[in-house]
């Protein structure tokens, strides 16, 4: 059976068709229209083109930058604001004349890595996307765990665990609350922290624009950059230990731009053990297998094998 996954992003809509074995059969990307009707049309056109090209019909799953309320059936919390308040799965289902499954894009990432990615075979997978923001999702036995409110995995909008005095009221998150995990361990948060330290030290140097800029300085032994990365690692460990203490997943998979920082992985185990209850932690924390394609593949796998 052919499975089609759609990643409905703020700037692009991408469709991937997968075989039963997970082999990619078709891929196409288009610019996201800035209105709801245009978005529906773009998704339907991509599905029809894939089916015409491959000569067969398939299932459709859609990953969105928001969630579907299990009570109203309406999309909420999406940064693509024109889909908020809409029964997206119902409307697409009517247009495509089949059931369409819709899930949060971070949950799709977790499903992708659980089904045939870096955590294949693990029963409970916590998938983390650390880039401009910080999202997460939970997959149990290869299926999305959305939870009773449809917000399972919204870990980035909890307060940073075990905050120091200096960390309290550092930054207000876009969600309206102060000191969210996202404001500290996203790539944006890492850059903000380093640049603040640079200013405080009175060092005459161009501000960093990305985590990669800082890691180049870390490799050179720059003291300010090394200290910023040390703080980042401790905050990441606290944040993930909080998940382990509550959920105790079989594997944690990192995605997003910060997941490409190789220095994270050898340092995490000892730091995690310091914060996990019992001071012992054997949870594997691994880099994703499918990179930026993982979310759209996970949308396809919303229709399980």
What are these regions (language model features)?
Residues 7, 61-65, 103, 126-133, ...:
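Short beta-strand segments
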Residues 1-59, 69-72, 90-100, 115-122, ...:
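ATP-binding/phosphotransfer module of carbohydrate and carboxylate kinases, centering on a glycine-rich
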Residues 27-29, 78, 147:
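Residue-level detector of high-confidence beta-strand sites
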Residues 23-24, 75, 144-145:
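Hydrophobic "anchor" residues
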